[in-house]
Amino acid sequence: MMKKLLLLLFIVCTSFVYAQENWGDLKKNKLTLKEIPPVWPGCSGSAVEKEHCFNQELSKHIMSNFTYPTQEYNNNIQGRVVVSFKINTKGFVEIKNVRGGNKGLQEAAKTIVLKIPKLTPGMMGGKPREISMSVPFNFKTNKK
């Protein structure tokens, strides 16, 4: 009986301690939604593991698909090309901008990016979201 009385007393006392009449202005509170980046096919695990896997797979993709345009190589045309693109809400790549280098180098870089496989799209608030990215390409012939 004494235990029940002490428990009841404890519950009553703690309810007074935590009771609040004024919750404050809810408009001042902000909810921050975390952006979840796209996921490369076959990548799994924690967010950090998926991001690491994505970066590794993208690097492998670039290395295995990289070709130096023949005309540019033969003429010792070199340069840095940056391809800006987005992964749309369906997981496909859409080129936004290609800058640097000449037309041939730009087309080669663009082709590599367009060969990226369908990804699991990025998410925010549980909904698919377009995610923008940029990838630099350095074209060097190592000729003198």
What are these regions (language model features)?
Residues 6-7, 17-144:
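Charge-biased low-complexity segments
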Residues 12-13:
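Repetitive helical segments and hydrophobic/amphipathic motifs
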Residues 1-2:
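N-terminal secretory signal peptides that target proteins for export/translocation
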